[in-house]
Amino acid sequence: MTIRRALVGLMWSLAVTACGGGGSSSTPSTPAAPSPVSAVHYTALGASDASGVGSSVPCVPFTTCDAGTGYVPVLARTLRATRDVTLVNLGIPAAVLSPTVYDIGHRYGRDIPADFIARELPFVPSDSTLITVFGGPNDVNALADAVEKGAAGSDLRGYLDTQIRAFGSDTDRLVQGLRSRAPSAFIIVINVPNMAGLPYASGYSLQARQVLQYLSVGLTRELNRQNGRGLVIADAMCDPQTYAPGGFASDGFHPNDTGYAGLAQRLASIVASGTSSASASCAQMTIVPPL
């Protein structure tokens, strides 16, 4: 943990003088995906998924890890079949997307090393032509943990709705920052699976799973709202492949090699087509009875 925090702190201190601030409130058109033969400057924002935790060859944070079997290096290798690819992997294990959730997590004793806006966004290279963002699952778990510790008081739904809106505002900031830092990048945002349907939650109480589901669907809708605002959405929530039992590591939370390979293939298909859409509703949004 000390080493991880030191790495994150070092990267942040190096970036303070190198990175500009702020984003634009405009709504840009979505840049085109890289052509099948053009060089790709790929930047990945994420958490332990970006490092391939749960795979047979996980990666040390902040390395290109060419032989890794997480979705980031697998996608990079897939794209290299037809073009040159430069990879910058900014994923920080256990990070959350939202600084609001980061603060809540620390308030309730959860060890969260970073959020995407403070510790990943400042390092996005301006020449990025492809960016993937996968955040939200750790945010869901951190908020559910806060609920378990009494954060919601007597108004559970009111508390959850407030945090979902705050996540949406933080997502706005992240997307605006990405568009400002890398205006030519084709951005793919992966939405949040229904965490109540993942194996790690199978032994939880019904109410705990209902909270996970409510948060997962709420955060996914906030991410989906960004579709067409200069990016496209990869729909993990409504893709049955996301929940395939054979795609998970032994912890029931992270994908294994099969799960990561499937995600990499879906992302490669989006890069190839230049388009993607997310469903407004699907059966996977109600894996357990609604809260």
Please tell me what each predicted stretch does.
Residues H41-V53, T86-G91, T129-F134, D139-N141, ...:
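Structural recognition of the beta-strand scaffold that forms the well-ordered cores
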